[in-house]
């Protein structure tokens, strides 16, 4: 009997010690990982920029923050969104695109003589001159070439364009529930000029630079820039 009681006490002591070790050593890392995953899934995450479509504002392989809670979209914000529901030429291949919001629902967008207009107001495109680039020049693989895009508006872009998604055909303004986006590196960016409008429901989040990034980069991915999206009238 005494031996049985002793064995039971030893077993209880072993399991008690094992539980304490679990709570002390194993549980904290599990909780930390759980908190990090919850934050990344629901609130904030980061992305690695792939390609040069947002150059010079964002560089290839640069890390950017993603705010998944911000659904109050503004002109000038940089966003990331799922490509396959918006770009019919992606053939279902899932990628995340990073572009800048140019037009909101109801906006008219046009390009004339090298200047971009939204609702007849000229857009501030100073971000094109970052890294010493001429504002009216586009950088491609280390060489400079003029922007040769013809003048256009949403109606002319969407009429008879086989690459446009179905909800983008024959539209004179940005449809409800969608956005018109462009990459800062206009000469190489695959964006709304080629596949049409982006559904808001496919947007992952609003992107911003990290605190240690270049000062101008941070400005052109911040609310300070969105508040100065249009060229100020003199």
What are the residue ranges of the model-derived segments?
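N-terminal capping/interface segment
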Residues: 1-12, 37, 42, 51-52
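Hydrophobic membrane-insertion alpha-helices, especially the h-region
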Residues: 24-42
